[in-house]
Amino acid sequence: RMTIFTTLLAMPDQFERLLAQVPADQLDWEPANWAGTPAEHFSARGHLCHLLDIETQGYQLRFRRTLEESLPLLASLDGYQLARDNQYPLQDTAVQLDRFRTARLQSVAWLKALPSSAWARRARYGDYGEVTLDGLVRLLVSHDHQHLAGMQWLLMRLNADLELALPLERAKA
């Protein structure tokens, strides 16, 4: 499981590198055409806020309930409703990134402390049906990858639609 923990812990830095490529005045930009996006329809700031909310209100709760309850029924969250409720465009990206980093560290520390028997605990999760705790962790990694892909797609659209010619890597100051 060390590899999956390493993957989970790398996410905040991976996301931060992509976010750094978005000009500050374009953090809330959304394209007119979302065709082909691999993620939900979020701005760069929206992706970040969504990752934090899904970590804290989604997966952390799902993990705990799977451990503590007998075959709990886990709800899927409406990402767009969370965006409205939590006013994503008003959030400070530095604060949100710090909160996401902290939440992810907490998630991994909690998971690392579990006995090996915990990984087979089961829950019923939305359209996925029955899943194990191990499966929930894999779904979180999948969700991370979806949003990294969504950010790459958004950077592609920023370049194409606004003719920004953003570099593939931000030069180090």
Model features per residue range: what roles?
Residues R1-L8, P38-T56, Y80-L97:
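Charged, low-complexity, helix/coiled-coil-prone segments
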Residues R1-D28, I54-L61, R65:
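Alpha-helical bundle segments that constitute or directly flank the non-heme di-iron/ferroxidase center
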Residues L19-A24, E69-L73, W110-W119:
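Proline-centered turn/helix-capping motifs that create local helix->coil transitions or kinks
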Residues W29-G79, V108, R122-A173:
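Short, contiguous alpha-helical
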Residues V22, F42, Y88-Q91, L114, ...:
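Short coil/turn linker and secondary-structure boundary residues
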Residues T7-M11, Y80-A120, L136-L140:
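Acidic/histidine-rich alpha-helical segments that form the ligand environment
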Residues Q14-Q21, A103-W110, Q146, G150:
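Solvent-exposed, charged/polar functional surfaces in cytosolic regulatory/catalytic domains
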